[in-house]
Amino acid sequence: MEGLLFNVNNGYIEGIVRGYRNSLLTSTNYTNMTQCESIDDLKLQLGPAYGDFLASLPPKPSTSALAAKTTDKLVSEFRYVRANAAGSLAKFMDYLTYGYMIDNVALLITGTLHERDTRELLERCHPLGWFETMPVLCVATNIEELYNSVMIETPLAPYFKSSLSLQDLDELNIEIVRNTLYKNYLEDFYHFVNTHPDMAGTPTAEVMSELLEFEADRRAINITLNSFGTELSKADRKKLYPNFGQLYPEGTLMLSRADDFEGVRLAVEGVADYKSFFDAAGLGGGPSGPGNMGGGGTEGKSLEDMFYQKEMEISKMAFTRQFTYAIVYAWVKLREQEIRNITWIAECIAQNQKERINNYISVF
């Protein structure tokens, strides 16, 4: 009965998204891409998957232009799915865009603080984080006007009202603002998928809980590691941790008290995956690519490498389930990683860094 009712409203969307998932690049595609000698060769390899979107690129395009066109495909497909979604699935997809909105608003706040023309910043905003009233924010000439506009004109208003004031919006606090908004967003999203009548007790709640708990844990760990050597107090740091996840509450309490990498490692020992990440990365590892991507296995990977790899594995497994909105979230994450992979390979080709070209993450 659950499947019957799901397919009445959402069967078409599920079919479309599974088709998008089947068009993702495979390890064979990546192997062929790493053999390319130029960006134009790479364009040819990407032709079957991205042809229509790459057609307008000039010869010898920049890697940033290539990345923008591959992002355009994700945006186009996402908007098509969203246009055909209805009811709780439409609201679910709106939640997916809030993370991008947070990044866009943080960018506009930073630009306003530096007295930049915020209209120029609109071009740098992520298209999935665009909302109808975003141009209104560009009318603001100072941080107070921007804050008042955000409080009224954006879907993020509830996340601001609950914990941020005008005094928080300064250059030193911008990352704290971003992380506070993300904390409120993740908690709201987690509550939504576990309490909405269409999702509570369904595969959507089960799979999305795993995905969001992983994201909450990753952010808590990264916030802790990035706070070392800064003026952020332990009490303020603790306020940035989402109040759910595999580490919550004991692990996050230990994270809030950690003074060094060893303290973080001890805090995550209760979760086998995270413990193995720290052991393999040697307490943090080093960067290996944009987003700190890494190749196969765990050898030579940074901590963030392994978080990305784990996220891809969870997202891949989401497609083994039926009758769930979670495949939309998983598909977006998988496509984002594909874009990072393409950009990384293109950068290595452009800079003639072939020895590092295999540092990408492929799960298919």
UniProtKB/Swiss-Prot annotation:
Protein keywords: Hydrogen ion transport, Ion transport, Membrane, Transport, Vacuole
Pfam families: vATP-synt_AC39
PANTHER family, per the entry: VACUOLAR ATP SYNTHASE SUBUNIT AC39 (PTHR11028)
SUPFAM superfamilies: V-type ATP synthase subunit C
Species name: Neurospora crassa (strain ATCC 24698 / 74-OR23-1A / CBS 708.71 / DSM 1257 / FGSC 987)
InterPro entries, sorted: ATPase_csu/dsu_sf (IPR036079), ATPase_V0-cplx_csu/dsu (IPR002843), ATPase_V0-cplx_dsu (IPR016727), V-type_ATPase_csu/dsu (IPR035067), V-type_ATPase_csu/dsu_dom_3 (IPR044911)
Chain's role: Subunit of the V0 complex of vacuolar(H+)-ATPase (V-ATPase), a multisubunit enzyme composed of a peripheral complex (V1) that hydrolyzes ATP and a membrane integral complex (V0) that translocates protons. V-ATPase is responsible for acidifying and maintaining the pH of intracellular compartments. This subunit is a non-integral membrane component of the membrane pore domain and is required for proper assembly of the V0 sector. Might be involved in the regulated assembly of V1 subunits onto the membrane sector or alternatively may prevent the passage of protons through V0 pores.
Name assigned to this protein: V-type proton ATPase subunit d
Molecular function GO labels: proton-transporting ATPase activity, rotational mechanism
One biological process term in Gene Ontology: vacuolar transport
GO cellular component: fungal-type vacuole membrane; vacuolar proton-transporting V-type ATPase complex; vacuolar proton-transporting V-type ATPase, V0 domain
Locations listed in the record: Vacuole membrane
Family: Belongs to the V-ATPase V0D/AC39 subunit family.
Assembly information from the UniProt record: V-ATPase is a heteromultimeric enzyme composed of a peripheral catalytic V1 complex (components A to H) attached to an integral membrane V0 proton pore complex (components: a, c, c', c'', d, e, f and VOA1).
Bilayer topology annotation: Peripheral membrane protein
Coiled coil residues, start to end: none
Presence of keyword Nucleotide-binding: no
Main location: membrane
Highest taxon in the source lineage: Eukaryota
